[in-house]
Amino acid sequence: PDYATDLDLVSSTDSELPTVTCPETIPNCGRKRLHGDHTPADQIVGAGAGDFPVWSNFGAPVFNSWPTWRSTNHQQVYWKWLERAWRGGMRLMTMLAVTNEFACGSANRLRGTDCRKSMPAIDKQLDAAYAFQSWLDSKSGGSGSGWFRIVKTPDEAEQIIRVGKLAVVLGIEVDTLFGCKQTNTCTPDFVAGEVDRYYEKGVRHIYPIHDFDGGFGGSALFNGFLGAANVTIEGAPFISQPCPGMSDDGTLNCNVQGLTGLGASLIRKLMNKGMLIDIDHMSAKAVDETIALAKQHGNYPLMVGHGLFNEVHASGHTRHERMRTAAQLEQLHSLGSSVSVMTQDEIKDDPRCLHSSVTFKRSYEYAVSKLGGSAVAAIPFGSDFNGIVRHVGPRYGDGACDNNAAQRAAEANRPRLQYPFTIPGFGRFDKQVTGQRTFDFNTDGL
């Protein structure tokens, strides 16, 4: 249960946490509370991302309020749910090791954790991916027998997919990759060595830049909160400039920082290793510079791991620098890049059903049209599960259409997903039951 835990936690200030009294409904919940009730009075990780209502802190087996399509601070990828996706036909995924120095420093955490050093947490997550693979193997008959297989080459991925298993690509999405900040002295030789080291660990997918400016370049501006956090992490605010048509978000606009010299060196090294380079958190200037380097390197394909699209959104403080423009998509398509559609959308003007499969379809069809049409376009979905974002909301029930009453009433008369349903070639599926909770896509969303 998420109410409390027996892990050795300390507070965000490294002080002792009080021992809790477990509720009668969960008699053995643990000794220390992970977080409060998601109210504004609680720590930033509990309240800052909108996980409401109060009393949503019970996890397994009750699941009284989370996970939901809008919950952002809780585990959304329990292994049985991942298995269901595989059984339903998913055959390739990226498993990203992720951490955020600012969020780590704002939350209860394991004793001894140094939030200023991100890579040890990344190492632990990569090791855990291999341990998870071994654990599944042990449940399936021994080494290599499980349905979850970490792959390191396209040929390996194809072989795994052909035998009906899930091919898993390991990746890293972190704000301070290799510990390289603007204020330290990482060298090209050090960075090249780190790329080699993580390549040997099986990593093939890299975000050179994430939420903050760093040693490799400028971050896309899309959230005012991150500007304040950038001061804490990098010691300086973002410096922005107007970029009409790309960002309407007031003073946020676009980052003046592109790739640093070290960043350009990293991009070249990643291309030489044949790794996936994800541009999705880069500033527009860094994106342009990375595309230019890719063209110089024989039209090297790039990656958009959780795509949002500028033209899908109306102007008026809804578009921002992390959204891909039509011009960027044209260049990415010419390189043979992979561009995903994020399961969170920020569309605020849909006339039918906000933040639902309707708006996801709108973004998906736009991506297909820009990337070669339905005959050739292969569009992944970018879930960003556990990435402090929402997902595809429900079309029916109390919270449908992002609580838009008129849309909810109109949608109620439209056909629903009928359970059980059959996916040709993959079998028959009823509602997902986990613990004491039965999930229904119609009323729960993704």
Model-derived segments and spans:
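Short catalytic-loop micro-motif centered on adjacent basic/acidic residues
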Residues: 276-279
